Structures are given as structure tokens and as C-alpha cells.
């Protein structure tokens, strides 16, 4: 499936799932965890990981204001994703053009992640890099999963509850420390309790 069709499927699925993904069901979706635990990293890998965690907030600081992200093409998809035991992923604001581009650039994440706050606002908690598997595999020079500064992406295979083709994804919890690791999919201290579907609207 071409990247444009992937983005279209993303948008269609969002219309179906928006506002209802704060249920437990999505916690059962299985990702392949390829990222190396911090304790097992080499000195070079630790240095790369630290650099990535610094680059993300430097590159996304303007998105602390969600309206800036919206003006730059990011839009809420799938409501607020959470689960009972696995924590939450929060609200994913996706840039369809960046998804279609298929370029992995630490300074230009395809997704920025927010957590709803009690006062009705949104707190920026991280970024997510995403590339469709078919788009990645279409390049004959790609002989392994995508990697960003020493961090291998996780595979979200198809079929899945989103109705999307398989994709690779890498979460970076650069704005809210994750006790389970900066690059895991779920954050135990992110909550969707304050989620309101109106978060998709401009503030």
C-alpha cells in the first residue's frame, strides 16, 4: 500500500475510533520491543540515546502549545489510548504529510503526544516516529527495521484494531520521564482520565 493510502487509512480509522480508544482494548495490541534496555547499552549507544532525548524537546518545544502543532498539520487521531496495566500512550497528534514522506528525522516526528490535564488543557509528554512497513521495505537499501540514533523501532503488525497496514513506531518520552524507559511504547504515569473529545478542537 502506498504511503498516501496509508495516511488515508489513518484518517478513516481515526473517524471510527476517535474518542473511544480510551478503553482497555488497545492495551492488548502487541508491539515487538526491539529497543535495548538502558543497562545493556554500550557507551556509544547510551550517548546516542541521551542525545535523542535532548533533541526531541529542543525540536518540539513550540508544540507545548497544541494550536501550534495543529497549525503545522498535526491532528488528533484515535482519541486517548490507554490500558489498565500497561499505562497509557496518551493523545497522538499525527502529521499525515510527514507519515507519507516516510523520512526518519529526529527533529521532525510524525506524531507528538499529549496527556490531558485536569484544567482541560494538554501537556506535551513525548514524540512518536512512525513509518509504514511497506514504505520502508520499498527501499532496497533497507535490510533491517528502521533505527533512530541507536534505537530500533517497534513493529505494529497487521491486522490490528486500527485497521491499518503494518507500521514501525518509536516513542520517545522526552517531556515526561518514563520509569520503564524513554523508548518503550507505554507510559505508566500517563493517564487518559481527563480526556475530553473536545481536545481535538483548537484551544
Task: Name the predicted role of every residue range.
Residues 16-25:
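C-terminal segment of classical bacterial N-terminal signal peptides
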Residues 2, 26-28:
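N-terminal acidic, proline/glycine-rich, low-complexity intrinsically disordered segments
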Residues 12-13, 99:
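Residues at structural and domain junctions
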Residues 1-11:
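Bacterial N-terminal signal peptides that target proteins for export
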Residues 28-203:
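Primary mode marks residue(s) on the alpha4-beta5-alpha5 output face of response regulator receiver
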